[in-house]
Amino acid sequence: MAIARDGNVIALKENDEGFNHSTLLGVYVDDLLKENDLTASDLDAVAVSMGPGSYTGLRIGVSLAKGICFGAGKPLIAVSTLAALANAVAQREDEEAFYCPMIDARRMEVYTAIYDREGNVVRDIHAEVIEENSFADLLSTRKVLFFGNGSDKVKEVLKHPNAVFINGVSTSAANMIGLAERYFEAGKIEDVAYFEPFYLKDFVATVPKRKVL
């Protein structure tokens, strides 16, 4: 979670220790605002990840963002997690390549999309099971930069010389800021009452097996 002013991060709180969204997010909001002598009324807008990602995490994050927007009368901005990752990497790599963010799904499956250097969508967001011929059509034409927490597990599968893997790129509120400000300036805001995150896959509830002692 972050607070930004004029495109710069002025406060950031992150946690990667597990699924603690329900207990941490509300605390982080209060802490960030208090530590910077702000209230929700001082915000221009609230940006939230629209997905894809964890069903529970997206649901809790969007619900909290909606609550702030309703309570303070602020606009809601939705940013694709994959687009945010691609934009962040494109800003620092500055290379005419295809940008392929990957979010880990399960086994050899990832949530992914393809963007060009300017952020235009080359291949829409989708779930894909990675095998050795994945992205062969793109890799035959230019470099493809792979990054995100889903890219680590496919390094040994995608062996093409044009496949470049960038380490240390993770989902972060800080990566959303550039696109969020761009959308805000363009008036690209969501209907707070009806906005729903992009889960990509339907949620399937499971019942844990009973442990045998």
For every predicted segment, state its role.
Residues 1-50:
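N-terminal beta-alpha supersecondary unit
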Residues 8, 20, 75-171, 199, ...:
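Surface "functional belts" at beta-alpha junctions
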Residues 22, 26, 61, 65, ...:
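A general structural signal for well-ordered alpha-helical segments in protein cores
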Residues 32-36, 71, 89, 173-184:
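Stable alpha-helical structural segments in soluble proteins, enriched in small hydrophobic residues
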Residues 47-81:
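DPxDG-like acidic metal-binding loop motif
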Residues 166-213:
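Acyltransferase
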